[in-house]
A protein has these predicted regions:
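Bacterial N-terminal signal peptides
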Residues: 9-17
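Beta-strand/loop nucleic-acid-binding surfaces
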Residues: 61-83
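Short stretches within intrinsically disordered, low-complexity N-terminal or propeptide regions
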Residues: 12, 67-69, 115
Length: 120
């Protein structure tokens, strides 16, 4: 019985660590590369993400759009949460954006980012 409990605890621990250390999110609204950045007077950054050349099986809101990064945005770099990230134009860095709330249905779309995962 003790062996089964230890095995169960070990399995749950491993699963939890694996789940929280994934660099790619399981759901997101848009993915692509940062192709432009803007900084407002408050120092908040907005990034233009272009994913028109990326194929994904996930249903996305858009393949091209602006994501506003605020103090409420959670940023993950290679699976680990970070306080900030110096967003620059880099075709080798893939980002995954989850929007927070409504998105302006223009093209490119515009909205506040709830979460951004960065694969660097």
């Amino acid at each position: 019985m003790k062996k089964k409990i230890k095995l169960l605890v070990a399995t749950l621990s491993f699963s939890t660590v694996f789940f929280y250390c994934q660099s790619t999110p399981t759901t997101y609204d848009m993915t692509g590369y940062v192709v432009d950045t803007k900084v407002n007077s408050s120092g908040e950054v907005t990034v233009l993400v272009d994913g028109r050349g990326i194929e994904t099986e996930q249903m996305l809101i858009s393949d091209y759009g602006w994501a506003h990064i605020s103090d409420n945005t959670d940023i993950y770099l290679n699976g680990k949460k970070v306080d900030s990230y110096p967003f620059t134009i880099d075709p080798s860095v893939v980002v995954y954006v989850t929007y927070d709330g409504l998105v302006a249905e223009s093209y490119p779309v515009q909205g506040g980012a709830k979460t951004i995962f960065i694969e660097d």
